[in-house]
Amino acid sequence: MSKAAQVKAPWLNSRDPGVPATLTYSELSMCGRVEEMVRRYPDYIAYEFMGKCTTYADMWKKINACAKSLKAIGIREGDKVTICMPNAPQTLCMFYAVNMVGAIANMVHPLSAESEIAFYLRDSGSVAAITLDQFYPKFESVRKAVDLPCLIVTSVADELKPLLKVGYKLTKGRKNPKIPAGRAGVLSWKEFLRRGEYVEIYQVRRKAEDPAAILYSGGTTGVTKGILLSNRNFNALAAQIIATNPFFRPGHKMLAIMPMFHGFGLGVSIHSMVANGGHCILIPRFTPQSYAELIKKHQPNLIAGVPSLFEALLRVKEIEGADLSCLLGVFSGGDSLSVELKKRFDAFLKEHGASITVREGYGTTECVTASCLTPIHKQKEGSIGIPFPDTYYKIVKPGTQEEVPYGEEGEICLTGPTMMLEYVNHPEETAQTKQTHADGLTWVHTGDLGMMDEEGFIYFRQRIKRMIVTNGYNVYPSQLENILDGHEYVHLSCVIGVKDPIKMQRVKAFVVLKPGYVPTEACKQELMDYCRKHIAKYAMPSDIEFREELPKTLVGKVAYRVLEEEENAKLDAKAAENAKIDAQRRQLEEERKAAVQERKAKKAAEAKEAKEAKEAAKEAAKEAETPKE
């Protein structure tokens, strides 16, 4: 009996019909798996960008051209190449070309600050990088401090249709910085491809277990780290995604809005599609209006995104009248989907002709992305679903490997074929996160709080470190957010803990109201009264602050840490102001005391002087009364 067979798996009876408990996984590299699709579906559309479609056969030619050029500039097996790009053809082709030559793709957000880019380049040990012309100044500045032998600079225009290219160069492209010709170590996209024209086709046959990509995440400790993932990790995910969506057919369209530097975007929206004959519609930049228009125009079969993406769609008029009967799968992940938002978006889908509901998933970058998904035919309110085939979950007492009973909260642990190789340059954190349990399996300790019911459905609560402790009670922000989001006034909410000298932390809520509602004291009182009816006294918000919008992370999650930092900054400023006032008070008190002392001293001196004068007068009088001989 295998080790995995000994693990409790109550979810097996909750699988959709046709979804197997175990799968057979490709032993090829990621690129090798894509090559299989090229042979099977050469004339199918692999990706589409700004109205320009590229078949699998043509995509393969582009990947080969990139691979030859990578060889020409000296990239070899095991080298790291940073890809700092939005979703664009160059990003996709370069990613698979890097894989083809046996190198490792280091995926970085193009809006990263200079200091962050420098960190990513140093941390990964990258020997080359590719970015857009509009981000060139950041890299040029960084190159002075970081040893980066080669920088490839491309433009959106490089992959546009001729007319669109002209239009782009006359409008948005005019604002982009010009790349100096002949700059040492800097190549334009055209020059980069020219370098490989006379190089033989170059492909390194890598194994499934070989490293393929580095994705950055806060990890289970909250500190940014590179997560090293293998070919098997990505290929296993692609197989699991298709297995849990048995309706999928080659040629189905995925609107790829999630970025390729994120596990959700790279693993689900891109690789799971091109590794199975899917059609990716590449979206380089998100706005609610353009996203709504793209859905109406392209009629995708699949969309995947974070909750804020779905929340944004509910607010834009551009989606009105859209026929969404084309949708076969809508997936939410990357952040907690509130019960209320799911209800609203499910109703929205139904109103627009879709016969499906949002399926929530859960995952961590330590396992590429999703490892758990709500089944099609059985959903439970508040649940993030059941584990993928060959993936196992258990809930343990935090800080231990001790499994807790069904229905009891603890730390979510998981194991399966998508589990990372390691944290780059962080062996201690790797050992803390990947732990071998008594069952002999290696488990990822996620740092997330959750629960499993008797049917194997998983319920995510929140990050363990996000838990608020007030007066000794544990308060879970996500639960309070679910309650607040259920009020008819509330569009979106975020709950945080604020430092308190007596309670340790107090609860504060931030609320974005729905259109038509005004943030008045009466409105705040209505929400506070609502909270009193639905929230335990110890968990009640001490304050509700209205915002027009909430801060978001680079991938669209609500950035609760930004709100925490803002509140901490206010407290620090208040503490500094109080300290200043206290110092002023102390100074005034010292000055008052000094003045009192001075007055006392002066009075004493005057009294002494008066006494001495009086005594002198007495002596003089006495002397005057004494008869002279």
Where are each of the predicted segments found?
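AMP-dependent adenylate-forming
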Residues: 9-13, 32-55
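Conserved adenylate-forming
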Residues: 70-75, 196-210, 214-256, 278, ...
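Gly/Ser/Thr-rich phosphate-binding loop
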Residues: 300-305, 314-381, 392
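ANL superfamily adenylate-forming
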Residues: 12, 141-208
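AMP-binding/adenylate-forming catalytic core of the ANL superfamily
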Residues: 112, 129-131, 303, 416, ...
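Conserved ATP/PPi-binding loop(s) of AMP-dependent carboxylate-activating enzymes
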Residues: 386-390, 402-435, 475, 570-572
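Conserved AMP-binding/adenylation subdomain of ANL enzymes
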Residues: 235-253, 261-304, 316-317
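Conserved AMP-binding/adenylate-forming core of the ANL superfamily
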Residues: 43-88, 92-96, 113-118
